[in-house]
Amino acid sequence: MPQMAPISWLLLFIIFSITFILFCSINYYSYMPNSPKSNELKNINLNSMNWKW
């Protein structure tokens, strides 16, 4: 029964909210996609104009 144990519920809510936000932000910003290099982009653009029909 929570009435018998006066726990600071607001403090617990703030702590859990901060940890949840930190966890989500770490997961979001930890993924770094590989960006293509400029030489690869030039090759892709040249090869894409070679139509086979």
Curated annotation (Swiss-Prot):
Chief location: mitochondrion
GO biological process, one term: proton motive force-driven ATP synthesis
A Pfam family hit: ATP-synt_8
Keywords linked to the UniProt accession: ATP synthesis, CF(0), Hydrogen ion transport, Ion transport, Membrane, Mitochondrion, Transmembrane, Transmembrane helix, Transport
Name of the protein in its database record: ATP synthase protein 8
Membrane topology: Single-pass membrane protein
Family: Belongs to the ATPase protein 8 family.
Cell compartment(s), UniProt: Mitochondrion membrane
GO CC terms in record: mitochondrial membrane; proton-transporting ATP synthase complex
Transmembrane segment boundaries: 4-24
Subunit structure: F-type ATPases have 2 components, CF(1) - the catalytic core - and CF(0) - the membrane proton channel.
Domain of life assignment: Eukaryota
Coiled-coil intervals, chain numbering: none
